[in-house]
Amino acid sequence: MMAAAASSASGSRRVPLVVPDLGLADRGLAVSLWLVPEAAAVLAGDRVVELVAGGVTIDLEAPVDGRLVVQLVEEDEPVAPGLVLAEFETA
Protein backbone atom coordinates (compact mmCIF):
# COMPACT_ATOMS: atom_id res chain seq x y z
CA MET A 1 0.00 0.00 0.00
CA MET A 2 2.81 2.41 0.83
CA ALA A 3 4.49 1.67 -2.52
CA ALA A 4 1.31 2.61 -4.35
CA ALA A 5 1.06 5.83 -2.38
CA ALA A 6 4.70 6.67 -3.09
CA SER A 7 4.20 5.89 -6.75
CA SER A 8 1.21 8.17 -7.12
CA ALA A 9 2.82 10.91 -5.01
CA SER A 10 5.79 11.06 -7.39
CA GLY A 11 3.52 11.06 -10.44
CA SER A 12 4.94 7.85 -11.93
CA ARG A 13 3.29 4.46 -12.06
CA ARG A 14 4.16 0.92 -13.13
CA VAL A 15 2.61 -0.37 -16.35
CA PRO A 16 2.93 -4.03 -17.42
CA LEU A 17 3.71 -5.28 -20.92
CA VAL A 18 1.45 -8.30 -21.42
CA VAL A 19 1.60 -10.93 -24.17
CA PRO A 20 -1.49 -10.30 -26.32
CA ASP A 21 -3.62 -13.12 -27.71
CA LEU A 22 -2.14 -13.39 -31.19
CA GLY A 23 -3.74 -16.71 -32.07
CA LEU A 24 -0.25 -18.26 -32.28
CA ALA A 25 0.08 -19.96 -28.88
CA ASP A 26 -0.25 -23.39 -30.52
CA ARG A 27 2.96 -22.66 -32.50
CA GLY A 28 5.22 -22.38 -29.44
CA LEU A 29 5.34 -18.65 -28.73
CA ALA A 30 8.63 -17.50 -27.13
CA VAL A 31 10.67 -14.38 -26.43
CA SER A 32 13.22 -14.14 -29.22
CA LEU A 33 15.08 -10.92 -28.43
CA TRP A 34 14.89 -7.98 -26.05
CA LEU A 35 15.41 -4.85 -28.14
CA VAL A 36 15.65 -2.52 -25.12
CA PRO A 37 17.74 -3.18 -21.97
CA GLU A 38 16.48 -2.72 -18.42
CA ALA A 39 16.61 0.89 -17.16
CA ALA A 40 16.45 2.28 -20.72
CA ALA A 41 14.16 5.20 -21.52
CA VAL A 42 11.39 4.47 -24.03
CA LEU A 43 8.62 6.29 -25.84
CA ALA A 44 5.18 4.76 -26.26
CA GLY A 45 5.29 2.78 -29.50
CA ASP A 46 9.02 1.96 -29.38
CA ARG A 47 9.71 -1.68 -30.21
CA VAL A 48 10.95 -3.34 -27.01
CA VAL A 49 10.75 -7.11 -27.45
CA GLU A 50 10.52 -9.59 -30.29
CA LEU A 51 8.38 -12.73 -29.97
CA VAL A 52 8.61 -15.69 -32.31
CA ALA A 53 6.07 -18.43 -33.09
CA GLY A 54 7.14 -20.93 -35.72
CA GLY A 55 8.35 -18.76 -38.59
CA VAL A 56 6.37 -15.70 -37.49
CA THR A 57 8.07 -12.77 -35.69
CA ILE A 58 6.05 -10.22 -33.72
CA ASP A 59 7.42 -7.00 -32.20
CA LEU A 60 5.72 -5.66 -29.09
CA GLU A 61 5.82 -1.94 -28.33
CA ALA A 62 6.27 0.09 -25.16
CA PRO A 63 2.82 0.89 -23.77
CA VAL A 64 3.89 4.25 -22.26
CA ASP A 65 6.58 6.92 -22.29
CA GLY A 66 8.99 6.15 -19.47
CA ARG A 67 11.58 3.56 -18.52
CA LEU A 68 11.74 -0.23 -18.80
CA VAL A 69 12.14 -1.16 -15.13
CA VAL A 70 12.38 -4.95 -15.29
CA GLN A 71 12.32 -7.75 -17.87
CA LEU A 72 10.44 -10.66 -16.29
CA VAL A 73 11.11 -13.22 -19.03
CA GLU A 74 14.46 -14.34 -20.45
CA GLU A 75 15.22 -14.67 -24.17
CA ASP A 76 14.23 -18.08 -25.61
CA GLU A 77 11.73 -18.60 -22.77
CA PRO A 78 8.25 -19.79 -23.81
CA VAL A 79 5.36 -17.41 -23.15
CA ALA A 80 1.57 -17.46 -23.39
CA PRO A 81 -1.16 -14.85 -23.83
CA GLY A 82 -1.74 -12.90 -20.63
CA LEU A 83 1.80 -13.36 -19.29
CA VAL A 84 3.51 -10.18 -18.05
CA LEU A 85 6.82 -9.78 -19.92
CA ALA A 86 8.09 -6.54 -18.39
CA GLU A 87 7.18 -3.54 -16.30
CA PHE A 88 7.56 0.10 -17.29
CA GLU A 89 7.59 3.18 -15.10
CA THR A 90 5.87 6.21 -16.56
CA ALA A 91 7.83 9.42 -17.06
Residue ranges and their predicted role:
Residues 42-61, 80-91:
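Short hydrophobic beta/alpha edge segments that flank linear recognition/processing sites
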Residues 57-70, 75:
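Short, compositionally biased
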Residues 24, 36, 53, 73, ...:
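Short, conserved catalytic or interaction motifs in soluble domains
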Residues 1-47, 59, 65:
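Acidic, low-complexity mobile loops and tails
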Residues 37, 74-84:
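Short flexible/disordered coil segments
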